Amino acid sequence: MTKQLLTPTQIGDLPLKNRVILAPMTRTRATPNGTPTELMAEYYGQRATAGLVIAEATGVDSSAISWINMPGIYNNEHVEGWKKTTQAVHQKDGKIFLQLWHPGRATHSLLINGQQPVAPSAIRLENNETHTPDGSK
């Protein structure tokens, strides 16, 4: 099994050096405005020996934030931050995908300046607590 796990494979047109895939995990290491940090570049760069790195859930809009320090990809500052992360992975011959995410009803109004969250239905999320800089609310 280990022997096969470490053999090259391909997903569509994307060749991978092995079959190890790092699943996306919530890291909460972006800046408060969602910009990826040097720590994120280091973290993903350290894991670039996997065949594929799938970076954490990343917000696609400023009105869709469900936890503090959640990374985004909806402005130029975010894009530049992700470029550094991508470069850190590519420098080690790694491949990286970004998990694009809109949390919908899991968005918390405390994290979007009191705005109404945008979701596919008006059904509230039960027990919608969130972590804020001032603790859980």
Predicted features along the sequence, with ranges:
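Flavin-dependent oxidoreductase catalytic cores
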Residues: 1-137
